Amino acid sequence: MGHKPLNEQVIVITGASSGIGLATARMAARRGARVVLAARSEDVLADIAAEFGTRATYVVADVGRREDVQAIADHAVATFGGFDTWVNVAGLTVYGPLRKIALEDHERLIQTNLWGTVYGSLIAAEHLRGRGGAIVNVGSIASDLAFPFQGLYATSKHAVKGFTDTLRMELIAEGAPVSVTLVKPASIDTPLPNRARNYMDREPTLPPPIYPPKEVANAILHAAIHPQRDIFVGGGGKLFVMGKEFAPGAYDELASAIIAQQKRTEPPRNPKGALHAPQGAGRERGDPPIYVMRSSAYTRATLHPLATAGLAAGLAATAALVLGGKRARRRP
């Protein structure tokens, strides 16, 4: 199964006002695609769409509401005559121990991360059955790993993986010309921690190694053209998953270290975050206190399998960083 070149596609992107979604929208537009941007922040969406001129349109939507997601699809059809790729990026997180997090915060996270993906995927599949195309869901290495102090985030991403795999199998059984890809990023330098609901006594951050959002955007757009079942973004994340599969009990014993790696030294800046109301959108990147990798040689090699030498080098470099506990500060 193959898909149209990117410069002939219309691509719907949820969560397009910040982070991975924004990076994907910009990269897609630069490569000639027309884009339909969806998020909760209207003023930010309007500014982003203005960057791309007639190649972009936007819809203010909360993906936790099915009627809003249907409105995204309807707007894409009305504006561009349909769409070829649907990318579910919208997602939130909550930091803190499970026992201390309010039930309404748990529910809101699941509504966005899981149900937003379910609504988007099913609506997209209905449209694409007749014309072919791609559904790309953004999971996480938390689709394969538990994360203490991000328990419901990991729960939601495990569920996204199960749903995505099932949808793929059902579309294959139908003979539908629709590819379904799960992209699983490691830690990515986005504003996600800054916009999180935070119950901790410190400002949240991400465990190393951290990768730039352009790596995820590139993987997503690769899947829009070249169907691929799963894509890990970040060799460090792949190593963690492999380690957990090899020694799950040993991974459990890392709980205290994993919790510590999610805390900065300063007190919380904005503990309510953007869980229940949009705020802090408009930026691709966050402000992690440690070095951010320039790229992921591992991921680029998996997208281009002939680059085996690059894959080996990337894994070796990432292993050295993870095992050595390198803590160099981010370069300006």
Where are these regions (language model features)?
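Conserved glycine-rich cofactor-binding loop
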Residues: 10, 17-19
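SDR active-site lid
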Residues: 173-267
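Substrate-binding pocket helix/loop in short-chain dehydrogenase/reductase
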Residues: 97-98, 105-107
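Residue(s) in the substrate-gating loop at a strand-loop-helix junction
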Residues: 140
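Active-site helix of classical SDR
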Residues: 121, 156
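Conserved glycine-rich Rossmann-like NAD(P)H-binding loop of the short-chain dehydrogenase/reductase
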Residues: 31-47
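The beta1-alpha1 cofactor-binding region of Rossmann-like NAD(H)/NADP(H)-dependent oxidoreductases
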Residues: 61-71, 103
